[in-house]
């Protein structure tokens, strides 16, 4: 607990992100990763391998932008740093491990940025409703971006803002995911997407109890490799059930088969 509290206090975090609970969530993930390291290992390696395949898809290798690089457990940073002239690790909060890794690599830069580009407006009530959420724009005009990686964030974008708005007014937010998908399609370089599709609730005997969409009504319109992530093994959240995510990895959306 002392280490968690210290990590929370010393990790740089914009005020809006701290208000929404991003620092607290980052510390929680660090702790859960420590407890569930073995269960998470296949998912993390699968994610890294998808990014490695995306690197091979990029004909030019000037700049890579990684969206959702806050902890880096699922990121083959050494491969990216070796392959590209510059690596931009984009997130609202960057954990101690990824900060140290960036410091060790001269061509790796941390970029503190809200990838939805709407959190401030949502929290301050400047958006009438989810349908008025602005489309993200950052990095779109940069011709040197040869690879974009959306790293296990598509299902997470509405989570903390949605919780905040539900606490404030009973509202719900899910449009961030759809806006993020549209944003990715506007890049001219290779775009790699890794993200949760479904959340499965399993009984203690392993039987499936319920399957829930992880995307809050949005969809990922591309086919790719899928696998299961044992995000909360039996006993992690409750002694009577486990939680497992179905994840998709798409090295290049332009080369992937589109799905309805």
Which functions belong to the PLM regions below?
Residues 70-84:
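Conserved SAM-binding loop of SAM-dependent methyltransferases across substrates and taxa
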Residues 60-72:
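Conserved class I S-adenosyl-L-methionine
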Residues 147-150, 176-183, 188-196:
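Conserved beta-strand signature within the Rossmann-like core of class I S-adenosyl-L-methionine
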Residues 130-166:
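A short SAM/SAH-binding and catalytic strip from SAM-dependent methyltransferases
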Residues 2-61:
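Class I SAM-dependent methyltransferase Rossmann-like catalytic core
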Residues 196-260:
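Charged, low-complexity C-terminal accessory regions
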Residues 101-142:
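S-adenosyl-L-methionine
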Residues 85-91, 112:
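Conserved SAM-binding motif I beta-strand of class I
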């Amino acid at each position: 607990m002392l280490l968690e509290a210290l990590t929370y206090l010393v990790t740089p975090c914009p005020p809006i992100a701290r208000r929404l609970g991003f620092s607290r969530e980052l510390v929680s993930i660090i702790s859960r990763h420590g407890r569930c390291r073995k269960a998470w290992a296949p998912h993390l390696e699968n994610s890294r391998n998808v990014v490695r395949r995306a690197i091979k898809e990029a004909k030019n290798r000037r700049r890579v932008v990684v969206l959702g690089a806050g902890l880096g457990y699922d990121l083959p940073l050494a491969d990216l740093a070796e392959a590209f002239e510059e690596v931009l690790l984009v997130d609202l909060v960057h954990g101690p491990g990824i900060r140290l890794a960036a410091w060790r690599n001269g061509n790796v830069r941390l970029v503190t940025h809200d990838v939805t580009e709407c959190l401030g407006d949502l929290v301050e009530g400047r958006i009438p409703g989810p349908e008025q959420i602005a489309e993200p724009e950052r990095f779109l005009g940069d011709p040197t971006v040869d690879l974009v990686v959306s790293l296990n964030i598509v299902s997470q974008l509405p989570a903390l803002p949605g919780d905040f708005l539900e606490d404030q007014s009973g509202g719900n937010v899910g449009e961030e995911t759809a806006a993020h998908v549209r944003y990715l399609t506007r890049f001219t370089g290779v775009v790699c997407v890794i993200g949760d599709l479904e959340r499965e609730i399993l009984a203690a005997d392993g039987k499936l109890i319920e399957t829930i969409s992880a995307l809050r009504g949005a969809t990922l319109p591309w086919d790719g490799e899928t696998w299961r992530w044992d995000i909360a093994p039996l006993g992690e959240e409750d002694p009577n059930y486990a939680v497992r995510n179905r994840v998709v990895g798409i090295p290049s959306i332009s080369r992937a088969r589109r799905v309805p």
